Amino acid sequence: MREKLSICLGSLIALSSVPLRVYIVTDGPSADVARQVLADASAKASSDVLAELLHVDDMLAPLLDLISFLQPHFSSAGYYSKKLFFLSTGVHRLFPEGVRHLILLDIDLQLRSDIALLHHHFALFPTGTIMGLGYELQPVYRHGLHKYRQEHPGTTCGEPPPRGNPGFNSGVVLIDLEAVRNSSTYKKFLSAEGVEFLVKKYSFRGNLGDQDFYSLLGWERPELFYVLPCTWNRQLCEWWRYHGYADVFDEYHRCNGSVHIYHGNCNSSIPSVR
């Protein structure tokens, strides 16, 4: 984890042309490591960096009501069972109203471009949009929606772009906190009843935390989401290529253009900088 955090923070800070306000969510044992990594990265900063470490338990305590109905549907006994993977769904509760925009980043990322360029995508959100995420670049939800897709021939849910919506990946999330707070639609679905409706309609049982919820909500109410270009979350994992989906894998995994953020999910190696 230390190496991943070092790569992510180091690239974020080194390439930023604007002052940064950075929040690192951590636990007690990891806090000292995070402080050292942050100090090392900040030494190479070209802009001001204001950083704060937030304890995961303090962040999650106000969200336990949400987690209580999300976790049974969108987690397993493995890595993604941790409550941390539902933090983004209620993060609008945790920041004061003066904070309008938030960019959430996994730590298994390496930036190749200035984060200010990513922030510019907030200006592209249509009215009513609350979040921006890139598509999932594997047929994860083609698999997860197998029953729904059998019962609804011709559906675009779980299909690769451009003809369909393959679901989202939450490695990079742009959140308009004000829009989330003002969205009656989001509030409606971020409830025990709303989640139950979604999982029943789509015959879905997931294990990837918040991105499962966003994917379901994106199929049901696509107007809530801005689709971030794949180059801002260029996922590298190819697990599904070797587990039953080799024939369609490239349709999902294709991502043309200069990569701004590499995402080394499932411990994939990130290409070296040339």
Predicted regions and their residues:
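Glycosyltransferase catalytic domains, chiefly GT-A lineage
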Residues: 1-274
